[in-house]
């Protein structure tokens, strides 16, 4: 067996991954009518053929009608998606790779004049700079419905043969609850960190009840918004610990920064010409502080950088 650290198997809960290489979620914008049909399936399967241990698809699939994609994404709130998901997962598994999907509710990070023309929702009326639509302040019955929407979507994904689900938190509705900059609710879902995290944990509880223990659940989230008044590094570490201690998830997928502006987005997802792996040390700090499986993706675009990330224990 090769001594290359990238090629060593990795145990994630009940899954044995054949190496340490994962393609994290991103959206190629290939869905047809919100479904992962032939072109989408072929795009995803090629990663498995290339030898990755796991590929994550969708960036991100919508769980609710009032979370209309701003470009062509999967619609996880439709029952008809299940057989299309099954065709894709079967094809990936035949190539020896695991497959997960990323689910989200966009909250304010979308527009009302798309999809079904429904009001967009957030824990405050503050609009996002990038999308600029003013959200309705979320109400109790909205929260209950959206939690159920996440659970329903999770059940569909398991029925479709997925190995797990990753919740997209940063910048989207879950993060809008967690961040003090975007949460102006009173009562059980606003104010203290415990309250601001309640929505996220309630979503995971509902999903776990549907999918059982033999299914991977994780979260891609920001542990430092790098914004005055937002989630800072110290609070981000506490969020990370609380996510682990909840017992509801199996890994963390950590990023640093914010995506509500174009400059902020390029710091989180660096473009060509920018520094490689700018947040790798930060992700390593989260892993060290939590002693918990930690994923990270932010311009780790070459084998040498990826190998260093694993070999150095980051």
Report each predicted region and the residues it spans:
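Flavin-dependent oxidoreductase catalytic cores
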Residues: 1-314
């Amino acid at each position: 067996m090769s001594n290359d650290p990238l090629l060593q198997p990795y145990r994630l809960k009940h899954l044995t991954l054949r190496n340490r290489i994962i393609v994290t979620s991103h959206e190629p914008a290939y869905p047809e009518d919100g479904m992962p049909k032939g072109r989408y399936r072929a795009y995803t399967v090629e990663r498995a053929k290339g030898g990755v241990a796991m590929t994550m698809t969708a960036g991100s699939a919508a769980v609710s009608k009032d979370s209309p994609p701003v470009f062509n994404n999967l619609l996880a709130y439709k029952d008809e998606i299940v057989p299309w998901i099954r065709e894709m997962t079967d094809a990936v598994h035949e190539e020896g790779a695991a497959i997960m999907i990323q689910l989200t509710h966009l909250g304010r990070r979308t527009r009302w004049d798309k999809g079904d023309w429904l009001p967009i929702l957030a824990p405050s009326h503050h609009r996002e700079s990038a999308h600029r639509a003013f959200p309705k302040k979320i109400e109790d019955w909205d929260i209950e419905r959206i939690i159920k929407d996440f659970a329903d979507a999770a059940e569909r994904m398991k029925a479709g043969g997925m190995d797990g689900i990753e919740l997209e938190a940063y910048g989207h509705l879950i993060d809008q609850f967690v961040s003090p900059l975007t949460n102006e609710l009173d009562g059980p879902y606003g104010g203290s960190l415990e309250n601001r995290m309640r929505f996220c944990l309630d979503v995971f509880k509902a999903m776990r009840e549907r999918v059982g223990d033999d299914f991977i659940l994780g979260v891609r989230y920001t542990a430092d918004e790098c914004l005055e008044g937002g989630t800072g590094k110290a609070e981000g570490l506490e969020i990370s610990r609380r996510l682990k201690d909840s017992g509801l998830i199996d890994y963390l997928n950590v990023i640093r920064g914010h995506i509500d502006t174009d400059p902020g987005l390029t710091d989180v997802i660096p473009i060509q010409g920018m520094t490689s792996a700018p947040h790798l040390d930060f992700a390593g700090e989260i892993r060290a502080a939590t002693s918990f499986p930690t994923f990270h993706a932010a311009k780790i675009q070459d084998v040498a950088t990826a190998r260093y990330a694993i070999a150095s224990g980051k």
